[in-house]
């Protein structure tokens, strides 16, 4: 049924202008459409997109979008240069501990988490070979 469908993350924003500035200016995504509701569509890699819409305050305590990257250290360095602050976690029950904002999970994955201007938790991740 949905095995060939493209998934599009949908994120809330209290201040759509502020969110747009972050996603365009800080993350480098391109606005590819606007919705009068109001909302914006942003182009991500490999033909994927995000939809961000304005709504009253809301919070999520989990990752809502993860961007797959080839070099997590280089991406984290560039995002830090642009003012992004990475979260630090130490969760022994999950075997999860960040070092300088990046967690290595076994021998298969690295991830780093940060918040957008609206409090949504985003991540960059790299599969390890």
Predicted segments with their positions:
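A generic "structured core" feature
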Residues: 24, 40-41, 93
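Conserved catalytic-core motifs of GNAT/GCN5-like acyltransferases
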Residues: 10, 30-36, 91-93, 126
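Helix N-cap motif at beta-to-alpha junctions
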Residues: 15-16, 69-73
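Short hydrophobic/aromatic beta-strand element in the GNAT-like acyltransferase core
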Residues: 49, 66, 111-113
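N-terminal beta-strand motif that seeds the catalytic metal site of vicinal oxygen chelate
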Residues: 1-20, 63-65, 125-129
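C-terminal "cap" of GNAT-fold acetyltransferases
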Residues: 2-6, 14, 37-50
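Vicinal oxygen chelate
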Residues: 1-2, 76-129
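Amphipathic alpha-helical segments
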Residues: 17-30
């Amino acid at each position: 049924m949905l095995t060939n469908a493209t998934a599009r993350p949908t994120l809330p924003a209290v201040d759509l202008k502020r969110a747009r500035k972050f996603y365009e200016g800080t993350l480098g995504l391109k606005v590819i459409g606007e919705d009068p509701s109001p909302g914006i569509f942003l182009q991500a890699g490999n033909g994927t997109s995000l939809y961000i819409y304005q709504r009253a305050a809301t919070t999520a305590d989990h990752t809502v979008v993860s961007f797959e990257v080839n070099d997590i250290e280089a991406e984290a360095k560039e995002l830090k240069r642009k003012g992004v602050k990475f979260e630090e976690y130490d969760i022994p029950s999950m075997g999860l501990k960040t070092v300088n904002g990046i967690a290595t999970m076994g021998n298969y994955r690295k991830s780093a988490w940060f918040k957008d201007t609206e409090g949504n938790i985003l991540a960059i991740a790299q599969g390890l070979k």
